[in-house]
Amino acid sequence: MSRLFLPPINRAMRTLDPSFFQKTIPLTAAHVLDGRNIPRVTKECARDLLRVPRLRSVITQKDDAGMERKLLLLRPEVKHDDLSTAQPKTREFVEERIIKLEPYTLHMKYESWNYEEIMNAILPEDLEEIPCAFTQAGHLAHLNLREQYLPYKHLIATVLLDKNPNVSTVVNKIEDVGTGSVYRTFPMELLAGQDNTNVEVRESGCVFRFDFAKPGEAVADVMAGVGPFAIPAAKQRVFVYANDLNPESYKSLVGNIHVNKVSQFLTPHNLDGANFIRESIRTLLSRSRNPSTSKVSIPTPGKRGQKRPPPPTVIPVPPTFSHFVMNLPASATTFLGAFRGAYRGLEDVVTGQEMLPIIHVYTFHKSSVTENAAGDICADISRHLGREMGEGDLENLENVRLVSPNKTYYCVSFRLPANVAFEDAQVA
């Protein structure tokens, strides 16, 4: 992009002042006298049109009488009072009175430029690059700023927040906090936006809510297939137990774990779904209590010139699952009975309703009347759980898509009721 269209520079800025970023640029516009000629003029005068990212070359403007007219913004080299600066076709259209060249003033402001352009105008030139990389989970953007960028962290975060409409919270990992503790679990510093690390992520019609400041949640994927949900979740440092009964799917899942290098966070299983539900609950608890398997260590990138590597980030394995995912819409609800009594004997571990998992079940609703879906799905869930479940018990009911005229694909989410989890006898 030409320097002419870049924002003004202020390398002394430490607190963002959007009003500083304003620019007035004199240009030439071609007034298309008959709007029907716009496609033709746009095509044949393409070499003279203004080409700047995020700026439209065709604009609508009202004249003194309030009538709308179409203008084509031209490149800066074209002068309205010097036809020799325009391409031959543009000159020809002027002579034929198809267009009329006139002066135009382009006003640019803070909203006109993106994150990289603003940061290039305010960060010191001797910094190697603009810090652009961040991890996004729901509304939260997570930065991991290197030392040289820390004096500008609030400035960086504020601009990042402004330029990403889906972000409302920006945090930075604090490298030096917690180095003396057993678990270095992502201490966070709020840099900009709302002080809210409870994020909501949508995946294949399901809604997952978790606290980003508390890493290492555990998820059980009961019908995982080759890992389309499990692999991305493990990459976010979520402990995933992934299961599939099909030996070929299991084989592919194991291969995908290796290729994607997520073996520390993803454990594959090849079991019947009901058996997996019951066994995984006990297996995870045992893992969390075993000193040799109760945590995962992740190397922490060292700072430039640092002689000794920093302590690793240590993520403890939780004792219980936060979520169970059951994506087999034709029969997933029939496996819900496996949760009946599955937590029996674990009352000392699961000390509150909030420690019981959110269950996400995919299912079909075979009716063209979608208004009946919630009631019908709740009745199906109730039948298999052995407990009445109403619409008020659901965390979420998502219409994923219409599969056929009389069949709709849903994802329903609810927290496992305590009287089901601790039922006296497990039901086959």
Swiss-Prot record:
<dbReference type="InterPro" id="IPR029063">
    <property type="entry name" value="SAM-dependent_MTases_sf"/>
</dbReference>
<comment type="similarity">
    <text>Belongs to the class I-like SAM-binding methyltransferase superfamily. TRM5/TYW2 family.</text>
</comment>
<keyword id="KW-0489">Methyltransferase</keyword>
<dbReference type="GO" id="GO:0052906">
    <property type="term" value="F:tRNA (guanine(37)-N1)-methyltransferase activity"/>
</dbReference>
<dbReference type="GO" id="GO:0002939">
    <property type="term" value="P:tRNA N1-guanine methylation"/>
</dbReference>
<protein>
    <recommendedName>
        <fullName>tRNA (guanine(37)-N(1))-methyltransferase</fullName>
        <ecNumber>2.1.1.228</ecNumber>
    </recommendedName>
</protein>
<feature type="binding site">
    <location>
        <begin position="272"/>
        <end position="273"/>
    </location>
    <ligand>
        <name>S-adenosyl-L-methionine</name>
    </ligand>
</feature>
<comment type="subunit">
    <text>Monomer.</text>
</comment>
<keyword id="KW-0949">S-adenosyl-L-methionine</keyword>
<dbReference type="InterPro" id="IPR025792">
    <property type="entry name" value="tRNA_Gua_MeTrfase_euk"/>
</dbReference>
<keyword id="KW-0539">Nucleus</keyword>
<feature type="compositionally biased region" description="Polar residues">
    <location>
        <begin position="287"/>
        <end position="297"/>
    </location>
</feature>
<dbReference type="GO" id="GO:0005759">
    <property type="term" value="C:mitochondrial matrix"/>
</dbReference>
<dbReference type="GO" id="GO:0005634">
    <property type="term" value="C:nucleus"/>
</dbReference>
<dbReference type="InterPro" id="IPR030382">
    <property type="entry name" value="MeTrfase_TRM5/TYW2"/>
</dbReference>
<comment type="function">
    <text>Specifically methylates the N1 position of guanosine-37 in various cytoplasmic and mitochondrial tRNAs. Methylation is not dependent on the nature of the nucleoside 5' of the target nucleoside. This is the first step in the biosynthesis of wybutosine (yW), a modified base adjacent to the anticodon of tRNAs and required for accurate decoding.</text>
</comment>
<dbReference type="InterPro" id="IPR056744">
    <property type="entry name" value="TRM5/TYW2-like_N"/>
</dbReference>
<dbReference type="Pfam" id="PF25133">
    <property type="entry name" value="TYW2_N_2"/>
</dbReference>
<dbReference type="GO" id="GO:0070901">
    <property type="term" value="P:mitochondrial tRNA methylation"/>
</dbReference>
<feature type="binding site">
    <location>
        <position position="327"/>
    </location>
    <ligand>
        <name>S-adenosyl-L-methionine</name>
    </ligand>
</feature>
<dbReference type="Pfam" id="PF02475">
    <property type="entry name" value="TRM5-TYW2_MTfase"/>
</dbReference>
<keyword id="KW-0808">Transferase</keyword>
<dbReference type="InterPro" id="IPR056743">
    <property type="entry name" value="TRM5-TYW2-like_MTfase"/>
</dbReference>
<keyword id="KW-0496">Mitochondrion</keyword>
<feature type="region of interest" description="Disordered">
    <location>
        <begin position="287"/>
        <end position="311"/>
    </location>
</feature>
<keyword id="KW-0963">Cytoplasm</keyword>
<keyword id="KW-0819">tRNA processing</keyword>
<feature type="binding site">
    <location>
        <begin position="244"/>
        <end position="245"/>
    </location>
    <ligand>
        <name>S-adenosyl-L-methionine</name>
    </ligand>
</feature>
